Amino acid sequence: MSKISTKLKALSAVLSVTTLVAGCSTLPQNTDPQVLRSFSGSQSTQEIAGPTPNQDPDLLIRGFFSAGAYPTQQYEAAKAYLTEGTRSTWNPAASTRILDRIDLNTLPGSTNAERTIAIRGTQVGTLLSGGVYQPENAEFEAEITMRREDGEWRIDALPDGILLERNDLRNHYTPHDVYFFDPSGQVLVGDRRWLFNESQSMSTVLMALLVNGPSPAISPGVVNQLSTDASFVGFNDGEYQFTGLGNLDDDARLRFAAQAVWTLAHADVAGPYTLVADGAPLLSEFPTLTTDDLAEYNPEAYTNTVSTLFALQDGSLSRVSSGNVSPLQGIWSGGDIDSAAISSSANVVAAVRHESNEAVLTVGSMEGVTSDVLRSETITRPTFEYASSGLWAVVDGETPVRVARSATTGELVQTEAEIVLPRDVTGPISEFQLSRTGVRAAMIIEGKVYVGVVTRPGPGERRVTNITEVAPSLGEAALSINWRPDGILLVGTSIPETPLWRVEQDGSAISSTPSGNLSAPVVAVASSATTIYVTDSHAMLQLPTADNDIWREVPGLLGTRAAPVVAY
């Protein structure tokens, strides 16, 4: 084992929180931003075509919108489509709106010298400073006036800002994760940014974003350990050079090294990496770093974690392996379970059971040593925090409750978490699931899908904030949700033609999964690193995530409408 690995393991031991279950059945102790345009100064690797002679007005406008995907040289490519006077007054940096598509219609009153064209489309997002995607769902309308200049049509009046069709965003920008630690210091959390593909300095863009800190949407849920004096100087002589890091102790420097190395590595920036802080190696003993040196912090390590499939059938839980179905012991086979979550690594089961007219949240080991920790009229399917350090459920459709073990008494305690919904969002929460990192929370409210950020206002306190609708195109059809290990959100719906959808965590894209032999509604969904499991109107089905579009019944559960539970 390398010296840095030894040091990392020691640090991890200090930072780690205790797991939800210790031994067989116990719960743990509680324990000057740069905008996107400033990154665009590097030259593009592609020559951009400008207006062509005798181009028709509608084609010229479409060429203008396409050129707006190139932010280099203050959007010089797009300005080539404007009249000379408008070039100096148009402000492309005002906003970047993403539309599903752009429709054009010439308005009445047009002449051979001047035309006004209406622009319409559904705005599905906005690209904010630093490449942050903010999902939207609103109709967009604007007008563009065109005049002839030297015999050629040019745009003479238009709204400030850039309009991009979603396809142009995908064709010319790529999402990259900038990594920040969760409050426990255990796990790196991706902060997704859309960056221009053809920048010749992607690594420097990423390091500048890292130093600038997390985006506003996720910042309440992660840690930014750098002071406002920190800055990224640049990439010089093979070194990533930073200043203003003198306040960081050894552990903080190690964490920052992990952030930088994994941010670069996941953007396919080749290592090894030399990180220099204030003129000296960031880590004095390790001037050059590789991902192997910091493997303990690999943000995708859990995507390779071994998982176990369980099935909830007729109110009882069973382990499913190679076609064999083995019922769990004791209370877990009592026939009264409505939903469940299982952590095989911590040997803990959390299940919502029904007793008479109330729901009961029961927690314990797989061997059956259990405790009833919550009772209420309704309780949502449980969900575990990272490393099973606590579990959550929503009571009576409105109050998230966190269950963990008190550091003072050693007893299981329930703490209500505050949830800050947008003003126009009302209705009961029918599904609530934490991401694998525990920093994001997805929920279904009145059939709509929302994602928020879990924050820690004080010791033992939790709040879910910055809640945004991420799949408005699904309407009110969502029934079930599950986070894939890679951070993609799976959504089961009642839509007959396409009952299962995948949603990017920032809401930038939504796409249907193969649905040839799926029958709506999809009332349950779960996933491992390699397989998606669902319960449709007939049975429990599985689909390998790689290059496969045929859903098949799960061996051992043929003809059975069980609900999948994937445990890690």
Swiss-Prot record:
Keywords: Cell membrane, Lipoprotein, Membrane, Palmitate, Signal. InterPro entries: GerMN (IPR019606), Lipoprotein_LpqB (IPR023959), Lipoprotein_LpqB_C (IPR018910). Its main location: membrane. A lipid is attached at residue 24 (N-palmitoyl cysteine). It comes from the Bacteria. One of its GO terms (cellular component) is plasma membrane. HAMAP family: LpqB_lipoprot. This is Lipoprotein LpqB. It comes from Corynebacterium glutamicum (strain R).
